[in-house]
Amino acid sequence: MAQLTLKNIKKSFGQTEVLKDISLEVNDGEFISLVGQSGCGKSTLLRIIAGLESPDTGEILIEGKSVTNRAPKERNVAMVFQDYALYPHMSVAENLSMPLIMARLPLHARLPFLRFVAPAARRDRPVIAAGVEKVAKQLRIGHLLDRRPAQLSGGQRQRVALGRALVRDPKIFLMDEPLSNLDAKLRVQVRSEITELHETSGLTFVYVTHDQVEAMTMSDKVALMQTGELLQVGAPNELYANPANLDVARFIGSPEINIVSADPGVGLKLGNVNLPAHLQDVVAGDLKIGIRPESITVQNMPGLAFANAPDNSPTLAFNKRLVEDLGPELLIHGTFEFEPETPIRIRAQKNS
């Protein structure tokens, strides 16, 4: 395990500022997800941690020691790429063994025709084989060791890529959109396998994704990025329940949170309903209120039956436009009567 610290990381490509003064702390054995839209800088930040890119300014520390100017091989981190990056002409066993072989060879012996005959590789074959066997057992891919990547499914190739990173016994595990090439069903399966791998290995994981579901379900901590900045860092439920701003509130949660206008007045007035609220810190001007789709209870909607709302709940008139049947629940689209130009989404459980 290892603690990772990023201090004031900045990075630009030409005139484009990609990372804007990023500081982040990842504790020993923690699983943190860097999440955000494409182009927010999360993959660049991961590559800087790995040593594949250099920051313009700032410092990277692993276990309290600066690795900012160290080569990737000197950082003892392992990275899993989106495209797996497996050697197509090698078996699974050979793919898994390559990091162990290369780590034992001097630079001049790393040419393809020399690596398997170099003394270090021959001498350590039993150790290398034991490492491959251990990882294959851990990831349940022992029956695939003689196959080549072209003979594997997408999920199997992903497990081999994980194994090739894990076999090095790294301090930190870096993953860049590892599930993006898998279909929806397989993503759920491999997602749970990665979570299990984190729990059993105890390693520090830094995981890049644009998928908030992956980030929320797998992580101890989520770092939400936007245009090169960290908007909020915290436990998944902290970002969901206490978003730092509207951008965080809109990104976290599915369907997206409803944002409507409100009048501070006395307490808080939403349409014709007065809501209890503490607004001492609210300044004069426009006020927005966020309402999660799953926090709205639907009643008296023709053709639909729902559980009763809690007593004394505020009631707002709603105009239904579309209902999507998702099996155990419904996604209802429409508008509140007091603000008909703002689309509203309601996620409602069916009344069984």
Place the predicted regions along the sequence by residue.
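ABC ATPase nucleotide-binding domains
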Residues: 86, 91-247
